[in-house]
Amino acid sequence: MQIRRRSPNPPVEVDTLRYQVKVPDGEPRHILEEIVWHKEKEVDRLRESLPLLELRKQVQHLPPPQDFLGAITQGKTQPALIAEVKKASPSKGVIREDFDPVAIAQAYVKGGASCLSVLTDAKFFQGSFENLALVRQSVDLPLLCKEFILYPYQIYLARTKGADAVLLIAAILSDRDLSYFLKIIQTLGMTALIEVHSLTELDRVLAIEGVSLIGINNRNLETFEVDLKTTSQLLAARRDKIQALGIKIISESGLHTPDDLQFVQQAGSDGVLIGESLVKQPDPTQAIANLFG
């Protein structure tokens, strides 16, 4: 998947790296490219109101992050559950009208989730970094910031809002960015969940030093179609290398039934990331019990 980047702004310098993105012509070709183009402008606006230097100062005064990877390894369920606090998505629209991020997060904790994921994208998922901060204040589990990370700025912002881990999507990042962002995340004591959807993306990520956690997204982010066999096919193709490197695997998207969980666990997944099928239920705690029964 080749994502064109769009940014009308001048170069941005972070430490010794200089970021400048060519502006493509035309309209976005699919929803993922539309999200990326919008995110570039969104981050520019955030930088104007809260500079990166200020974020980095704030991070220095925070307590150490929790061990997200360790929580997966010692999962309270099998496979370990990353339960997602999610109001909406481009494919489903609003999933839960009476959305209360704190109440949902607390229900997940009660249900036995090992970690939580909080959507922070506003335009396409109706999330926010404020939701991440609210959840951080209300629960003790490790938190993943589920965001379309394009710049180091977003990593520091996620940390200031209480994230212990951040999502990096291979489809929207170059190899250089993946490697550099991973180093920033590790320097901050956080965990990177690096998401792939294809064998090409998986091979790119496996070639990067220091990767410990990979998410296999069963959803094609160009079409938003879901196929659970994505997890089994990628793991079957690279199982030996993944095991040799000691990398943990999370299966993401399209998980709705106990049979789905059994399928991806037998394929080799150490954990699952589930949002929609839990959020839409009146009682998310009971929904977890029904899935993991």
Swiss-Prot record:
Q: Provide the E.C. number(s) assigned to this enzyme.
A: 4.1.1.48
Q: What pathway does the UniProt record associate with this protein?
A: Amino-acid biosynthesis; L-tryptophan biosynthesis; L-tryptophan from chorismate: step 4/5
| Keywords, ordered alphabetically | Amino-acid biosynthesis, Aromatic amino acid biosynthesis, Decarboxylase, Lyase, Tryptophan biosynthesis
* GO process annotations (BP): L-tryptophan biosynthetic process
The record's listing under Pfam families reads:
IGPS
- TM regions (residue ranges): none
| Top-rank taxon, per record | Bacteria
Q: Which reaction does it catalyse?
A: 1-(2-carboxyphenylamino)-1-deoxy-D-ribulose 5-phosphate + H(+) = (1S,2R)-1-C-(indol-3-yl)glycerol 3-phosphate + CO2 + H2O
PROSITE patterns reported in the protein's UniProt record: IGPS
In terms of SUPFAM superfamilies, this protein maps to: Ribulose-phoshate binding barrel
**Annotated Gene Ontology MF terms?**
indole-3-glycerol-phosphate synthase activity; phosphoribosylanthranilate isomerase activity
InterPro entries documented for this protein: Aldolase_TIM (IPR013785), Indole-3-glycerol_P_synth (IPR045186), Indole-3-glycerol_P_synth_dom (IPR013798), Indole-3-GlycerolPSynthase_CS (IPR001468), RibuloseP-bd_barrel (IPR011060)
NCBIfam families membership = PRK00278.1-4, PRK00278.2-4
Q: Which HAMAP family match?
A: IGPS_B (MF_00134_B)
Q: Which family does it belong to?
A: Belongs to the TrpC family.
The protein depicted here goes by the name Indole-3-glycerol phosphate synthase
The organism's taxonomic lineage, starting at the top: Bacteria, Bacillati, Cyanobacteriota, Cyanophyceae, Oscillatoriophycideae
What gene is it encoded by? trpC
